[in-house]
Amino acid sequence: MGLLDAKISNHNVLVTSVDNVLNWARLSSLWPMGFGLACCAIEMMATNASNYDLERFGIFPRSSPRQSDLMIVAGTVTMKMAERVIRLYEQMPEPRYVLSMGSCSNCGGPYWKHGYHVLKGVDRIIPVDVYVPGCPPRPEALIGGLMKVQELIRMEQIGISRVEALKKLEEKNIDPGQLIEDARKGAMAS
């Protein structure tokens, strides 16, 4: 009596799409690479500790960009460090995501006006998917940002990159934010 010999009943059948299965697998197993540069890195480390337990979300930190699918940029990115951030981003396999954590990586933080050596936001050198505000943000805020990344992954489709999808939306003059809201309402209605 093997698994193939068992009778299939209505309770054993699962109907879904390949997109949903792949997206579920990717969002249930995020492997972030933390790029801690300042005080935000301390909060990022606290999030990985036992009090918050990121492993319950399927999030396992990695130290190599070749093994990670999410880059968390936490802290002040200087002009000299920008080249290394780009290099690490390019070494990550597709699909890859970026979470910008804290005011310094979002917009330059307290150095935005007089800090000639500070990049005024990491989004000037690499594409950022989710911004987590704060100086430094609490671990709860980082967990909220990670859950937002999981929501983005849940809405992706096979064969269409995020860049292509956004270009198509721009050509049709459709607001992507409205589509996300419509998808959420549809998911809640069913």
From Swiss-Prot:
Keyword Zinc-finger: no
Amino acids binding [4Fe-4S] cluster: C39, C40, C104, C135
Keywords: 4Fe-4S, Cell inner membrane, Cell membrane, Iron, Iron-sulfur, Membrane, Metal-binding, NAD, Quinone, Translocase, Transport
One Gene Ontology cellular component: plasma membrane
Enzyme nomenclature, EC number: 7.1.1.-
One GO BP: aerobic respiration
Top enzyme category: translocase
Xref: InterPro entries: NADH_UbQ_OxRdtase-like_20kDa, NADH_UQ_OxRdtase_20Kd_su
Main location: membrane
Cofactor(s), by name: [4Fe-4S] cluster
Cell compartments where the protein resides: Cell inner membrane
Keyword Acyltransferase on entry: no
Molecular functions per Gene Ontology: 4 iron, 4 sulfur cluster binding; iron ion binding; NADH dehydrogenase (ubiquinone) activity; NADH:ubiquinone reductase (non-electrogenic) activity; quinone binding
Record's bilayer topology term: Peripheral membrane protein
Record text on cofactor binding: Binds 1 [4Fe-4S] cluster.
Function of the protein: NDH-1 shuttles electrons from NADH, via FMN and iron-sulfur (Fe-S) centers, to quinones in the respiratory chain. The immediate electron acceptor for the enzyme in this species is believed to be a menaquinone. Couples the redox reaction to proton translocation (for every two electrons transferred, four hydrogen ions are translocated across the cytoplasmic membrane), and thus conserves the redox energy in a proton gradient.
Family: Belongs to the complex I 20 kDa subunit family.
SUBUNIT field: NDH-1 is composed of 14 different subunits. Subunits NuoB, C, D, E, F, and G constitute the peripheral sector of the complex.
UniProt name for this protein: NADH-quinone oxidoreductase subunit B
Source organism per UniProt: Chlorobium phaeobacteroides (strain BS1)
